[in-house]
From Swiss-Prot:
This protein's name: Guanine nucleotide-exchange factor SEC12
InterPro entries (UniProt xref): Quinoprotein_ADH-like_sf, Sec12-like, WD40/YVTN_repeat-like_dom_sf, WD40_rpt
Listed GO CC annotations: endoplasmic reticulum exit site; endoplasmic reticulum membrane; nucleus
Residue numbers spanned by region Disordered: 101-135
Free-text function comment from the UniProt entry: Guanine nucleotide exchange factor (GEF) that regulates the assembly of the coat protein complex II/COPII in endoplasmic reticulum (ER) to Golgi vesicle-mediated transport. Selectively activates SAR1A and SAR1B by promoting the exchange of guanosine diphosphate (GDP) for guanosine triphosphate (GTP) in these small GTPases.
Amino acid sequence: MGRRRGVELYRAPFPLYALRIDPKTGLLIAAGGGGAAKTGIKNGVHFLQLEQISGCLSASLLHSHDTETRATMNLALAGDILAAGQDAQCQLLRFQIHQQKGSKAEKSGSKEQGPRQRKGAAPAEKKSGAEVHPEGVELKVKNLEAVQTDFSTEPLQKVVCFNHDNTLLATGGSDGHVRVWKVPSLEKVLEFKAHEGEIGDLALGPDGKLVTVGWDFKASVWQKDQLVTQLQWQENGPTSSNTPYRYQACRFGQVPDQPGGLRLFTVQIPHKRLRQPPPCYLTAWDSSTFLPLQTRSCGHEVISCLTVSESGTFLGLGTVTGSVAIYIAFSLQRLYYVKEAHGIVVTDVTFLPEKGCGPKLLGPHETALFSVAVDSRCQLHLLPSRRSVPVWLLLLLCVGLIIVTILLLQSAFPGFL
């Protein structure tokens, strides 16, 4: 078997920090930029159309939305609404895609997996907020409400996520406060101090519970603004108290084949860089008791981001050294790994959705993970379907083994039967 490697699907003209996929339209949305510094590097949100062409997954730029002087550092998706973290504010965007009548889709395309530019595509930035391509696909992006979500001395929104029914979104940032907002009005409905120092990540469960992790070494579970419990990993974990760890990321995920079942997954990384770096850890938690169920080492590369597949079957990890890995959620065993796929910090990872356009785009593979990094590249990581022996074949082999055993006994002992 050859060395695994990711496929470069798209290269943007700016560093990429956030990534989402719309299951309904098959749009891959990648965002980033160079920030406010006058370096000539633009800031934007790129909408890419994912397609299967000659059995290979391909991405082509459909629309580029200019975000002026603000780089998008984090994204959340709810239907046709994007919540984009840009500096100290959260900007809501609404995108609409529809096919123009009387146009034919482009049938030809490269057989190679990788970036594809549509014929005659207009320049990336459009002040009108809409682009129409020869294929007749039109995409419009509209700025909705925006609100400041962080108020520290150097304000920065670090994370944003929607609740299960997309009526609320929660934000966290450098000032350690969680703020919850109505969608789409962005009217603030809740605010509380969750951590001393910045919030690293947060996750909203379907029962309204909120999990936050911060640079103060704490991971807390909240019901509205009331502290329910704090995760106790290092007290019961595999590490010594001499090595301080902090929680880097948290995500809720479904339990496959258990309707309504839920798990919480967290990543723990060493707080300090040592000459001989200690391992990072991946932990699964019971979502009702918030007790650890299982912990495994996930290597000595520092983990930068975590995602969970739609069904809760797989976990995706990115590292600060550019590596990408896929783990199976129930056992926390690694199935796929590409060392230094990007060569620089992986800023976000996301799985291809398992509903909507996902199965059609996935083809014969078991899952697909997308990764973006500061190197401006979006990579595709495909996990081949694991071969399994059919039950009927196992039964046939058992019957054959019994018959052979009987024949051997009969030949060795003629009066045996």
